[in-house]
Amino acid sequence: MDDNRSTHSSMFGDLSTEEVTSKIILTAIIVLFMAVLFVLILHLYAKLYWWRIDQLQQQQQQQQQEQEQEEDQSSIAPPVVTRRQRRRFIFVPGQDALSNTGLTSFELSSLPIVFFRQDSCKDGLECSICLSELVKGDKARLLPKCNHSFHVECIDMWFQSHSTCPICRNTVLGPEQASSKRVEQVPDNAENAGTTNNNHDALSQLSTSSPEFPTNVLVWGRQDQVSTGNTNVGTQEDGAAGNGASQSQEAVVLDISDSSSRNHNVSSSSSSMRFIVEEEEAKSPMTTRLRSLRRFLSRDKRVGCSNSSTSNSSSSNAVASVDP
């Protein structure tokens, strides 16, 4: 009897310990699940919160950029009215200037509006803009020339930037309306065309009034100043004072040579050009350094060079300077 009691007590003790351990494991699982759920909810909340903050910052930046652009365009910026804009299609404009202008509200109202009926079109009709079929009772705008029909909202949005049919590309306006529209556009561009014609006339006058130089004279300079090789030698003529009405200052040096001394003049012009190039090279510090390096390297191999400079006493130089 005592042995039976001991076995029963040991069995009940084992059952109680198993129940306790199972309860502990269950509570631990529940606590872990709640912790994971709490972290997940906190993560979602933080993500939504920061997403809203980012959206607000982006909207503020966009508003600031729009305000800056408006201030740049006009000194007095109009009051900014924030409105919720509807999404719309953006169509690429064509090459024709008339098709890019679009239709006015008066021209849109002149186009007929019909209510779609299933009896009139057994096969069904599809709007080529929104790619959806017309249902019974839908408002459709019928184009008079090509007899194509579309939803009123779709075709009105298309006609904001176009004046042709989106399928066949035929003009919706008649020839009289299109010609009147072109005539309205011509006066706007008349002033610009006048200014461009005036500019072309001025350029042609400048090109015709440009001085002509002989072929044996070296000429260089800018648009408002013309000079030749010997700018320091010459005399001013009193007879050239009558041509001082021109606005641009011009200094011209002409080398007048005889037929017997053409070869001498060619050599003198080349020597004068060489002298000018040498003067320009002497002014730059890079050339002086190279020259000193050359002298240092060739100090043992110096060879006497004789520079022949021919001066022609028979050639006479005339300098004509025209002041404004």
From Swiss-Prot:
One Pfam family, short name: zf-RING_2
Region (Disordered): 179-210, 226-248, 299-324
Localisation: Membrane
Molecular function (Gene Ontology), one example: transferase activity
Keyword line: Membrane, Metal-binding, Transferase, Transmembrane, Transmembrane helix, Ubl conjugation pathway, Zinc, Zinc-finger
Chemical reaction(s) catalysed: S-ubiquitinyl-[E2 ubiquitin-conjugating enzyme]-L-cysteine + [acceptor protein]-L-lysine = [E2 ubiquitin-conjugating enzyme]-L-cysteine + N(6)-ubiquitinyl-[acceptor protein]-L-lysine
EC assignment: 2.3.2.27
Bilayer topology term: Single-pass membrane protein
GO BP term, pick one: protein ubiquitination
UniProt xrefs under PROSITE patterns: ZF_RING_2
Family matches, as SUPFAM superfamilies: RING/U-box
RING-type zinc-finger residues: 127-169
Comp. bias (Low complexity): 306-324
Pathways per UniProt: Protein modification; protein ubiquitination
One GO term describing the cellular component: membrane
Signal sequence segment: none
Stated family: Belongs to the RING-type zinc finger family. ATL subfamily.
Domain remarks in the Swiss-Prot or TrEMBL record: The RING-type zinc finger domain mediates binding to an E2 ubiquitin-conjugating enzyme.
Protein name: RING-H2 finger protein ATL3
Organism: Arabidopsis thaliana (Mouse-ear cress)
